[in-house]
Amino acid sequence: MARINQLVRKPRRARAKKSDVPALEGCPQRRGVCTRVYTITPKKPNSALRKVARVRITNGAEVTAYIGGEGHNLQEHSVVLIRGGRVKDLPGVRYHIVRGSLDTAGVSGRRRGRSKYGEKKPKE
């Protein structure tokens, strides 16, 4: 145990927080290219076919990113924008693809929460 005087001279260093999204390297979003678009099943007790894409980011990292919303137009070589944010029931999926940006279309016919899915306001 350190003495008070030692702590006055040299305080304890706070442990650095480990990043939840290391591939973004501190950036809010990153651009990347889809190398594979496929579906995976969630862990128990959920059941579905979740749409994901393997993406090679501009910094060279390759990550698995979730494609949110109903339906998508992504295929191999699509250029996408990646943001952080994990999917709780898909182990290893720590990133989301931003809808309505670059090659990713927004969710057509979406009326609520449109800003999260890249959809314009419908004409009345």
UniProtKB/Swiss-Prot annotation:
Residue numbers carrying 3-methylthioaspartic acid: D89
Region (Disordered) location: 1-24, 103-124
Entry's Gene Ontology cellular component terms: small ribosomal subunit
Superkingdom of the source species: Bacteria
Protein's GO biological process: translation
S-S bridge residues: none
Sorted UniProt keywords: Methylation, Ribonucleoprotein, Ribosomal protein, RNA-binding, rRNA-binding, tRNA-binding
InterPro entries registered for this protein in UniProt: NA-bd_OB-fold, Ribosomal_uS12, Ribosomal_uS12_bac
Pfam families: Ribosom_S12_S23
Purpose: With S4 and S5 plays an important role in translational accuracy. Interacts with and stabilizes bases of the 16S rRNA that are involved in tRNA selection in the A site and with the mRNA backbone. Located at the interface of the 30S and 50S subunits, it traverses the body of the 30S subunit contacting proteins on the other side and probably holding the rRNA structure together. The combined cluster of proteins S8, S12 and S17 appears to hold together the shoulder and platform of the 30S subunit.
Subunit structure: Part of the 30S ribosomal subunit. Contacts proteins S8 and S17. May interact with IF1 in the 30S initiation complex.
Homology family: Belongs to the universal ribosomal protein uS12 family.
Protein name: Small ribosomal subunit protein uS12
